[in-house]
Amino acid sequence: MRTFNIATEKSHRINREITAPEIRLTGVEGEQLGIVKLFDALRLAEEKDVDLVEIAPTAQPPVCRLMDYGKFKYQEQKKAHEAKLKQKVIQVKEVKFRPGTDDGDYEVKLRNLKRFLDEGDRTKITLRFRGREMAHQEIGARMLDRLKTDLEEFGQVEQMPKMEGRQMVMMLAPKKRK
């Protein structure tokens, strides 16, 4: 049978874990109580039925605060969870064209590009040349210019069209919302 040691990340020392002989103490409401002996601070914490939490261990003397540690950890956890919910992962969506892409297909792909940019995703537009199409790169450049003007209100060009092997690539970033 295997046993695993799961190390829990503890960011703050509390109560008897604090080793400094003197500390700078902050009260429950955030008021400064000055520099006091550790023993006195622990006694005060016990009287008020709260924990003594080391906030800044590297300061001279270390800064400690009287607080309900369980409530403090819960608030921190809640803040981290809300921050995680608010962040949006920006993806790069790719739409591929060919120099001979017809108007109907062009409109469908344009609609998809608009949707991607509206959702806040960056888009990569790839125009692939095959065989003799390489001799007519100006057709591809015209198509990318047309895309650029059609998508002006949804996003701005992040990377101007450039050749990468047999492909012409252009990157668009969504416009910042006001």
Curated annotation (Swiss-Prot):
> Is Metal-binding among this UniProt entry's keywords?
no
Q: What does this protein do?
A: IF-3 binds to the 30S ribosomal subunit and shifts the equilibrium between 70S ribosomes and their 50S and 30S subunits in favor of the free subunits, thus enhancing the availability of 30S subunits on which protein synthesis initiation begins.
Enumerate the GO terms in the molecular function aspect. ribosome binding; translation initiation factor activity
Q: Which UniProt keywords apply?
A: Cytoplasm, Initiation factor, Protein biosynthesis
The coiled-coil regions, if any, are none
Q: State its location(s).
A: Cytoplasm
Organism from which the protein derives: Ralstonia nicotianae (strain ATCC BAA-1114 / GMI1000) (Ralstonia solanacearum)
Name the family.
Answer: Belongs to the IF-3 family.
Primary localisation category: cytoplasm
- Annotated NCBIfam families: infC
Instruction: Give the quaternary structure.
Output: Monomer.
Which Gene3D superfamilies does the entry mention?
Translation initiation factor 3 (IF-3), C-terminal domain, Translation initiation factor 3 (IF-3), N-terminal domain
Q: Please, one GO biological process term?
A: ribosome disassembly
Taken from the UniProt entry, a GO cellular component term is: cytosol
Tell me which domain of life the UniProt entry assigns to the organism this sequence originates from.
Answer: Bacteria
- PANTHER family registered for this protein in UniProt: TRANSLATION INITIATION FACTOR IF-3 (PTHR10938), TRANSLATION INITIATION FACTOR IF-3, MITOCHONDRIAL (PTHR10938:SF0)
**Name of the featured protein:** Translation initiation factor IF-3
